[in-house]
Every structure is written in structure tokens, then in C-alpha cells.
Design a protein with these regions (language model features):
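Short, charged, surface-exposed hinge/linker loops at domain edges
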Residues: 1-3, 40-132
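DNA-contacting interfaces and partner/effector-binding or oligomerization modules
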Residues: 1-54
Length: 132
């Protein structure tokens, strides 16, 4: 099964969403959810109008994987992950996290990996939680 990578990025006015590995699939919105919905609508239109000449990735089964830039992730999940909680999980200073969320500073690849590993670890842990 192919993976269609949709990149979510925060611009100054809205959120962009586009397929990283399939040229021509785009969307945007005022929120991450709107951008996701819009890029899915764009994908359906792309398939409809290119059905006789689809890129290889769209010819068979595929799944969508969303990849966020740091500002998009931090803003979108700010009601779930406080800066304090993220600092405890990652060791990244809250002030730095605020700079990354606002786009004032760009995190290094090492910092992005640190956040990614912490979130993926939490995801794995939570997927094993069940209530009696």
C-alpha cells in the first residue's frame, strides 16, 4: 500500500496542506481541520480530472499520512498539550516552544526529532491503555 504524504504548514494567514509526493494536490483553511478537509476535496477533484493519467501512487491502494511543521502542530494541539507538558515530555524549554509555535524561530532537525519521538512514544503508550 502506498503512502500519500500530506504536509500541513502554518502560513501567516492560514494553514496550507499539500501532497509531498503527488504534484497537484493542494488545500488550505483557517484551521488544520479545514485544511485537511480542503486537501481531501482537492484530492478527489484531482482524481476525477486526471483519472486517465493518474500518478502511480494514486493508481492502487494508498493511505494518507499527515506530516506537520512545528508551528502547525503546536498551535493545533495547544488545547491538548500545554507548553509545560511538552517541556516535561521533550526537555525543550517552554519559551523555545513558544518561539517555534509563533514561527519566530525554526527548530533544528534534532529538536524536531526530539518532539517527534516524544509524541510517538506517548501515542504507543496510550494505544495500550484500556479501562476495566
Amino acid at each position: 500500500m502506498e503512502i500519500l504524504k500530506i504536509i500541513i504548514e502554518k502560513s501567516s494567514d492560514y494553514y496550507d496542506a499539500y501532497a509531498d509526493n503527488c504534484e497537484g494536490v493542494y488545500g488550505a483553511g483557517n484551521t488544520v481541520e479545514e485544511a485537511k478537509q480542503n486537501v481531501l476535496e482537492g484530492l478527489q477533484l484531482f482524481i476525477k480530472y486526471h483519472k486517465n493519467n493518474l500518478p502511480q501512487i494514486l493508481q492502487g491502494d494508498y493511505m494518507i499520512e499527515y506530516q506537520y511543521d512545528m508551528p502547525s502542530f503546536l498551535k493545533h494541539y495547544s488545547t491538548i498539550f500545554t507548553k509545560s507538558a511538552l517541556q516535561r515530555m521533550t526537555g525543550i524549554n517552554q519559551t523555545q516552544l513558544s518561539h517555534y509555535a509563533s514561527g519566530f524561530r525554526k527548530p533544528s532537525n534534532k529538536t524536531v526529532k526530539k518532539l517527534d519521538m516524544a509524541i510517538q512514544g506517548l501515542s504507543r503508550e496510550l494505544s495500550q491503555v484500556h479501562f476495566a
